[in-house]
Amino acid sequence: MELVAGCYEQVLFGFAVHPEPEACGDHEQWTLVADFTHHAHTASLSAVAVNSRFVVTGSKDETIHIYDMKKKIEHGALVHHSGTITCLKFYGNRHLISGAEDGLICIWDAKKWECLKSIKAHKGQVTFLSIHPSGKLALSVGTDKTLRTWNLVEGRSAFIKNIKQNAHIVEWSPRGEQYVVIIQNKIDIYQLDTASISGTITNEKRISSVKFLSESVLAVAGDEEVIRFFDCDSLVCLCEFKAHENRVKDMFSFEIPEHHVIVSASSDGFIKMWKLKQDKKVPPSLLCEINTNARLTCLGVWLDKVADMKESLPPAAEPSPVSKEQSKIGKKEPGDTVHKEEKRSKPNTKKRGLTGDSKKATKESGLISTKKRKMVEMLEKKRKKKKIKTMQ
């Protein structure tokens, strides 16, 4: 397990997490160890996303950088947007979706790292996007005062809803039965079946990050030191606790056996990990913390076990964000992908090709040996028949 965080200082931090198996309860303590610091971009980092293999970062320098966490190397960079990258979301291990200030939403093949489709999503900037747990839908908000629903199977707009103000965050619930739209310090809760607001929660300060801890409990952080847990059904605050000395910039939550963890990053430079209680009315206990001495902007958690990152759908049922026809139409455009290690990538490609050829050759050689064996057997039978005739 590894925490990754970006900052204004253009650096990507990586911290290895070491849980203490013997400790338990409120006295449980985990350890964070600095693993790497990488000068990732030429401007401040604005977004980060993780899957089971890669970490991707977006920046004000308009590029998306890819890092292979297994090999601990930079894998390359994606260049397509002409504005700050505002949001990055993986769906499984096959697709990455990016949004930026240029109003575009791009769907990327996370294997070949090609742009499958580029959609002019908003008249203004794309400020945030969220993918439905099924992978079939996505929501986006922008500076054109619209909330847009996207059909990812067909790669087209499904529904446009005008809202009174510019929203800056949108988030699906774990089961995808509801979603929240954030405008400044206001949280509007929408039901999927009616597409209407079922309730509104007001936070004290402008909201910077929200995370669903369950289908009805929402963690909210903003331009203050406090994190609050709200019940989306009753619209009441279940609990609040002081998490940092400065405003909280981002949060991330995940579950591993016997632990439900929320991670917070703040402008004070600290990253903290908290163990959630079953009763969300009780504040979580601090597992560990580390000071980066940087102004943090975005946060992610890379779980090194594939089992920890399994999607709710099996691979066979996992829907593709773009149809086959559109993937043919949306071929890789020149300049979409810029690999820093082009010379290295070519031999790798050849190596993959050679590996494929060698498997094919092995299969063919197996077929040839079978034919030879049959021919030998036939010749042997003919020879025996001739021998019998000669004896007669």
From Swiss-Prot:
Name the GO cellular-component terms: nucleolus
Q: Which residues form the signal peptide?
A: none
Tissue specificity is: Expressed in brain, colon, heart, kidney, liver, lung, muscle, peripheral blood leukocytes, placenta, small intestine, spleen and thymus.
Q: Give the Basic and acidic residues compositional bias ranges.
A: 325-345
Q: Which domain of life is it from?
A: Eukaryota
Annotated coiled-coil positions are none
Residue ranges of the region described as Disordered: 312-392
Any one Gene Ontology molecular-function term assigned to this protein's record: protein kinase inhibitor activity
Residue ranges of WD repeats: 33-72, 73-113, 114-155, 156-195, 196-235, 236-275
Q: Where in the cell is it found?
A: Nucleus, Nucleolus
Q: Which Pfam families match?
A: WD40
How does this polypeptide assemble, per the annotation? Interacts with PAK1.
User: What protein does this entry describe?
Assistant: p21-activated protein kinase-interacting protein 1
- The gene designation is PAK1IP1
